[in-house]
């Protein structure tokens, strides 16, 4: 699973997910991309599940680019713990994804293969997604 090697601070505020993606909103490396249509926190294990299902679908060919990285720690207090006594321990890591953000890209595969791989990967994610080509990414937003 993905997580940062080290961070400046161990814990973060939750923050807000307003507006569209500020960067990473176009297909930069591959031929096809999977973009988010709504805001969400994407966990590192969800990213890994998408990577596995896409690589299994492609078998030998194709290159997968993961364009998001889980750099935000999410904390959780133990069960049946009274309030107070500080913020809980880091439970998992998430990537803050806003609408229009390209999450995955693929290269070296046909359009049908990419479409099916992104459909399978989309089922692993908690948000609506859409496939875009390298040339016509503007029309999807």
Curated annotation (Swiss-Prot):
SUPFAM superfamilies associated with the record: Ribosomal protein L16p/L10e
Any one biological process term the GO annotation gives: translation
Family matches, as Gene3D superfamilies: Ribosomal protein L10e/L16
Highest taxon of source: Bacteria
GO molecular function, one term: tRNA binding
rRNA-binding listed as a keyword: yes
Gene Ontology cellular component terms for the protein in this record: cytosolic large ribosomal subunit
InterPro entries the UniProt entry points to: Ribosomal_uL16, Ribosomal_uL16_bact-type, Ribosomal_uL16_CS, Ribosomal_uL16_dom, Ribosomal_uL16_sf
Keywords assigned: Ribonucleoprotein, Ribosomal protein, RNA-binding, rRNA-binding, tRNA-binding
Disulfide feature: none
PANTHER family on file: 50S/60S RIBOSOMAL PROTEIN L16 (PTHR12220), LARGE RIBOSOMAL SUBUNIT PROTEIN UL16M (PTHR12220:SF13)
Quaternary structure (record): Part of the 50S ribosomal subunit. Contacts the CTC protein (RL25).
Family of the protein in this entry: Belongs to the universal ribosomal protein uL16 family.
Function description: Binds the 5S and 23S rRNAs and is also seen to make contacts with the A and P site tRNAs. Interacts with A site tRNA mimics, and is probably one of the key factors, along with a helix of the 23S rRNA, in positioning tRNA stems in the peptidyl-transferase center.
Name this protein carries in UniProt: Large ribosomal subunit protein uL16
Provenance organism: Deinococcus radiodurans (strain ATCC 13939 / DSM 20539 / JCM 16871 / CCUG 27074 / LMG 4051 / NBRC 15346 / NCIMB 9279 / VKM B-1422 / R1)
């Amino acid at each position: 699973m993905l997580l940062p090697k080290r961070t400046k601070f161990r814990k973060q505020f939750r923050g807000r997910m307003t507006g569209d993606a500020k960067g990473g909103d176009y297909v930069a490396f591959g031929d096809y991309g999977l973009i988010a249509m709504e805001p969400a926190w994407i966990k590192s294990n969800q990213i890994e599940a998408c990577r596995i299902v896409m690589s299994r679908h492609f078998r030998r060919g194709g290159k997968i680019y993961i364009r998001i990285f889980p750099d935000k720690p999410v904390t959780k207090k133990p069960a049946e713990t009274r309030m107070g006594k500080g913020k809980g321990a880091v439970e998992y890591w998430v990537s803050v994804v806003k609408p229009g953000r390209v999450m995955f890209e693929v290269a070296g595969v046909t359009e049908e293969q990419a479409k099916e791989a992104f459909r399978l990967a989309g089922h692993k994610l908690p948000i609506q997604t859409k496939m875009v080509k390298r040339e016509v990414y503007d029309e999807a937003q």
